[in-house]
A protein has these predicted regions:
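Conserved ATP-driven motor cores of ASCE-family P-loop NTPases powering translocation/secretion/packaging/pilus
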Residues: 83, 426-508
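Substrate-engagement module of ASCE P-loop NTPases
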Residues: 186-188, 376-382, 422-437
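Sensor-1/coupling segment of RecA-like P-loop NTPase cores
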Residues: 193-203, 208, 388-389, 429-443
């Protein structure tokens, strides 16, 4: 697709370099207050169109003495004279991608000539670069619009699902809203099946908007036949207006020693306590937790039986005894089929699963449940992948699965990432058809190796310098993007970077409202019944 340039020039390139970007002199006719950091512009070269982002603005004068005697408010003639001859503004412009005359996108490897004209990018340019939802081949999804524009910026959902992704931003910037938007796109476009660990009950049935008391639809409300709710607290789910599809109940046998490793920081357990847990497991196998909770009260006697230190047994018993207070944990299940088997059945049918925690919102509960379920699912997907590699039959190829976790730094900090299943999944990338979508306000708390495997990042406003450095680690043009991040509004703006988007882009995020709900409907369901009947017959 060829590009088209808007009629009114924004400015002209006067200097610059490939590594540092270009300097644009803002045109005299342009309104400087409409030239903003993060704005998407096109530089018209002879052979290429350079699509770029404005990263900084500077006021300039032709001679410093002009600043010694600035005109007063009433000196309009002098102001106009200076504006035409002596004062001007420049903008730092960073090229992100070029299009040749055939409309093919290429990396930036050259520079435009002096005085190349800079235009505001057009709607046609945006569609050429970022794709369109109407594309029948690629699974594009509209995430929002460029600053001061109305044309959709799309991400490639198939590429998004191929690698782990992240939604980052400080508290109150709308991370949950961005995630819900993204998940709705994945469900609508059938790009991947999702398993969502919903700690605060914000993705299933409904959720309250952060800015006011209004409620918005959850994924189950938008896609009733495509989303199932598994609940730890069925009473809480029913209070919000629906019965869960499955009530979660787990046995002590479902807990393995490695599941407890991720709780080391949360429980403040010494490494000797985990050594004791392994000793218990060596003797009691799958009944290790039941044995600890039954006999751990007499730590000295129990420690002698298994060859552990009494203080380690006592500490482990004290910390894990709270499991007995969780009503969804039982010593032995009353039936053979486990809830994880049922969950796998739903996922294999392409049904997205939201696990609601209800009133059980402690970090202990969230970490434990997420580890137990994800470990088992990952094992199943490893077996499925190995079978597919052996048979090479298309019907044996697993469907792509994306696991969604909040408070990701608690699963993926430098200690936990090397020991837990979530660190394994993040490092394996798409090897076994399982990826992560991590949501966090503290990306600096996530292990650096894991962060380097995050393919696509959707970043809302961040204020901590460590978090900014972490989220931009490994990104091209990191210095440029850091300036852009600093200019984001608190709400409804985000920076898209990475594997699923053609070039880094600042967007005004799509509004999650009645118009969005209608867009998510099946086209057949959105039309009147009589119209559908008339078309068929």
């Amino acid at each position: 697709m060829k590009t088209s340039l808007s009629k009114q020039p924004m400015g002209y390139i006067i200097e610059g370099s490939l590594t540092d970007g270009f300097v644009m002199r803002v045109a005299r006719e342009a309104n400087i207050e409409e030239v903003k950091a993060g704005k998407f512009v096109a530089i018209a070269g002879n052979q290429y169109t350079f699509f770029s982002m404005i990263t900084n603005l500077t006021l300039q004068v032709t001679h410093p003495d002009i600043l010694l005697y600035p005109p007063s408010d009433g000196e309009h003639f002098l102001k106009e004279f200076l504006k035409k001859n002596s004062i001007y503004a420049t903008a730092q412009v960073k090229p992100m991608i070029v299009l040749n005359k055939e409309g093919r996108a290429l990396p930036v490897k050259t520079v435009p000539q002096h005085f190349a004209t800079v235009y505001e990018a057009t709607e046609r340019d945006v569609a050429a670069i970022f794709g369109c939802e109407s594309d029948r081949v690629k699974k594009y999804f509209n995430m929002g619009t460029p600053l001061d524009m109305t044309t959709p910026v799309c991400i490639d959902l198939a590429k998004l699902a191929e690698r782990s992704s992240g939604v980052f931003g400080k508290s109150g910037t709308g991370k949950t809203f961005l995630t819900r938007l993204l998940l709705a796109g994945l469900i609508k476009r059938q790009a991947a099946t999702t398993l969502i660990f919903d700690m605060h009950n914000e993705y299933g049935l409904q959720a309250r908007q952060e800015s006011n008391a209004k409620f918005v639809k959850g994924l189950k409300s938008l896609f009733p036949s495509k989303v199932a709710i598994f609940s730890l607290d069925p009473a809480a789910t029913m209070r919000r207006g629906a019965s869960p599809d499955v009530v979660i109940q787990l046995s002590y046998e479902d807990v393995c020693v490695n599941d407890i490793l991720s709780l080391q920081s949360e429980l403040n357990l010494h490494s000797t306590a985990f050594e004791a847990a392994h000793l218990i497991h060596n003797k009691y196998k799958g009944q290790w937790l039941a044995a600890l909770l039954e006999q751990g009260h007499d730590a000295k006697v129990f420690a002698e039986q298994i060859g552990a230190h009494p203080e380690s047994i006592a500490a482990l018993y004290r910390k894990l005894k709270r499991i007995e207070q969780l009503p969804f944990f039982v010593k032995k299940l009353p039936h053979r089929e486990s809830v994880i088997d049922r969950l796998l059945e739903y996922l294999q049918k392409g049904i997205h699963v939201v696990i609601e925690f209800g009133n059980f919102t402690s970090t202990f509960c969230y970490l434990l449940l997420a580890n137990i379920i994800t470990r088992r699912i990952h094992s199943e997907y490893v077996l499925k992948t190995e079978k597919y590699l052996g048979t090479q039959k298309s019907e044996d190829e697993p469907e792509q699965l994306m696991i969604v976790i909040e408070e990701a730094h608690k699963f993926l900090n430098p200690i936990a990432a090397s020991q837990t299943i979530f660190g394994t999944i993040a490092r394996e990338m798409r090897k076994y058809y399982v990826t992560l979508l991590v949501i966090d306000q503290r990306p600096s708390g996530i292990d650096a190796e894991v962060l380097s495997q995050i393919g696509t990042k959707i970043v809302a406003q961040l204020s901590d310098e460590k978090d900014v450095q972490a989220v931009l680690m490994g990104a091209p043009n990191a210095l440029t993007l850091r300036a852009i991040l600093g200019s984001l509004d608190t709400k409804k703006q985000a920076l898209l970077i990475g594997h699923a988007i053609t070039m880094p882009m600042v967007i005004e995020t799509r509004t999650y409202d009645e118009i969005f709900y209608e867009a998510m409907q099946d086209p057949l369901m959105a039309r009147p019944v009589q119209q559908v009947i008339d078309e068929i017959f």
